[in-house]
């Protein structure tokens, strides 16, 4: 595995040097990078050894440092970090202020809002010139980055919802299989039954999840349950919603019961849900692939109450094995005033990120490169075999505009079931009406 890993990193460095050397005419130039993933310069501000980085913030920070230290263009990436919730409003505002970033991170679910308004630089040609083969991208990732036959983004990952599991607590509740894996439910009724059994045995909530209307973690779970029943929340043309349906009521009743039966703490925000899990206060954390590296490191450190950590695909509770997913991608926002030198440097940075996609996959995200997924180094990463099926089960809303607005419209009304006692049917009706208002923009 170490030989394979060293080969990955050597190839990445060699390609960086070759790429930047061939673009040497660009000269020394600063380029701006707008991103979320947090700020961690105190820990990683001067680190260039990627093997010492962990987590999303650590890995992207060190990758940026490494590019700045090693590229032969003399290019320097200057990073501006934005809090996740405000990110897309701030990115949109840059088109009015003129401070358009040279590179920006973007979710696949948001890209249609920008590509549909001609706000992104087409990348099919540049990626080909940089030697990035489109056939190395897994189909779902390439689809996410494409609109009307043109590639507008460099895919960076597929990320999805997972069950993060405290196996010590599961064993305490007699909910561990002989092979050491967690005993997970196979139906909605079984999930509630297991949750009650777990709570009785441990005195703790079965599930920890962000529940305070900021992240909308349960909206992702609701979408998952809808897809598992064969229903798309939004139609393929982005003009109709299918929320207030029998399938929607099944999903809403299950989520409502998780809270009404005391199987989850409704007071937890996102950091609180993670802390509860790390403190050994819940059996399962409902969160994404992005947490795997962090939780594994914390469990191994001996400093957290969480000691025995495992990962599981979100279980199939209905007819189909599906799970909510999205992608992080990198774009070059369109700017008619950007110099050729800045464009070359931005493209070189994208090539560097592509070459180091394995490093990003250490976060827990699934690589978008088939060559990385097939590698021994990737397969040897902690827990990857435990959620391998997620790559196949990953499902997203159609590539239509206003996906993020649909998501936001659902959060408040769904969360009202446990925050204000709204009945599931009333929550469904409100979600349907709210999403329909958003989708009128697509007509």
Residue ranges and their predicted role:
Residues 190-197, 236-267:
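Glycine-centered hinge/linker elements that transmit conformational signals in sensory
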Residues 124-137, 180-184, 206-214, 229-250, ...:
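Short, solvent-exposed loop/beta-turn-alpha elements that line the ligand-binding surface or hinge
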Residues 108-162, 190-194, 218-221, 306-312:
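Hinge/lid segment of periplasmic solute-binding proteins
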Residues 24-113, 135, 318, 426, ...:
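Conserved N-terminal structural module of periplasmic/extracytoplasmic solute-binding proteins
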Residues 171, 202, 350-372:
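Periplasmic-binding protein-like
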Residues 29-32, 148-156, 161, 188-240, ...:
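Extracytoplasmic/periplasmic solute-binding protein
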Residues 34-35, 220-229, 249-341:
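Extracytoplasmic/periplasmic substrate-binding proteins
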Residues 309-314, 361-416, 441-442:
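Long, aromatic- and glycine/proline-rich binding clefts that accommodate carbohydrate-like moieties
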């Amino acid at each position: 595995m170490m030989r394979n890993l060293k080969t990955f990193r050597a190839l990445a460095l060699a390609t960086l040097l070759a790429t930047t050397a061939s673009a040497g005419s660009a000269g020394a130039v600063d380029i701006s990078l707008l991103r979320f993933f947090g700020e961690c310069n105190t820990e990683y501000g001067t680190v260039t050894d990627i093997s010492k980085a962990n987590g999303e913030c650590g890995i992207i920070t060190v990758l940026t440092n490494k590019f700045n230290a090693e590229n032969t263009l003399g290019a320097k990436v200057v990073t501006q970090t934005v809090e996740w919730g405000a990110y897309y409003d701030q990115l949109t505002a840059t088109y009015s202020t003129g401070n358009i970033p040279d590179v920006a991170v973007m979710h696949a679910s948001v890209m249609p809002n920008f590509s549909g308004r001609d706000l992104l630089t087409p990348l099919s040609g540049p990626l080909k010139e940089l030697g990035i083969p489109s056939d190395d991208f897994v189909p779902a990732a390439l689809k996410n980055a494409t609109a009307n036959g043109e590639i507008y983004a460099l895919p960076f990952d597929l990320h999805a919802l997972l069950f993060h599991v405290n196996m010590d607590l599961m064993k305490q509740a007699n909910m561990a299989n002989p092979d050491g894996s967690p005993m997970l439910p196979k139906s909605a009724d079984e999930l509630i039954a297991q949750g009650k059994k777990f709570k009785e045995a441990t005195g703790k909530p079965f599930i920890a999840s962000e529940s305070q209307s900021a992240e909308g973690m349960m909206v992702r779970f609701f979408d998952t349950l809808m897809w598992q029943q064969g229903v798309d929340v939004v139609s393929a043309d982005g003009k109709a919603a299918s929320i207030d349906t029998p399938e929607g009521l099944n999903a809403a009743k299950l989520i409502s019961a998780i809270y009404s039966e005391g199987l989850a703490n409704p007071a937890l925000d996102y950091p609180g849900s993670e802390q509860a899990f790390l403190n050994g206060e819940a059996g399962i954390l409902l969160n994404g692939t992005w947490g795997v590296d962090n939780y594994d490191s914390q469990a191994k450190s001996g400093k957290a109450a969480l000691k025995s950590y495992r990962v599981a695909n979100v279980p199939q509770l209905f007819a189909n094995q599906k799970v909510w997913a999205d992608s992080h991608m990198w774009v070059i926002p369109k700017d008619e005033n950007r110099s050729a030198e800045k464009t070359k440097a931005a493209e070189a940075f994208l090539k560097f990120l592509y070459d180091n996609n394995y490093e990003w996959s250490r976060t827990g995200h699934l690589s978008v490169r088939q060559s990385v997924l097939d590698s021994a180094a990737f397969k040897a990463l902690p827990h990857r075999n435990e959620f391998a099926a997620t790559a196949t089960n990953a499902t997203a809303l159609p590539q239509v505009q206003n996906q993020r607005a649909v998501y936001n419209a659902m959060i408040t009304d769904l969360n009202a079931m446990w925050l204000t006692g709204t009945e599931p049917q009333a929550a469904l009706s409100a979600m349907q009406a709210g999403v329909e208002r958003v989708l009128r923009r697509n007509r």
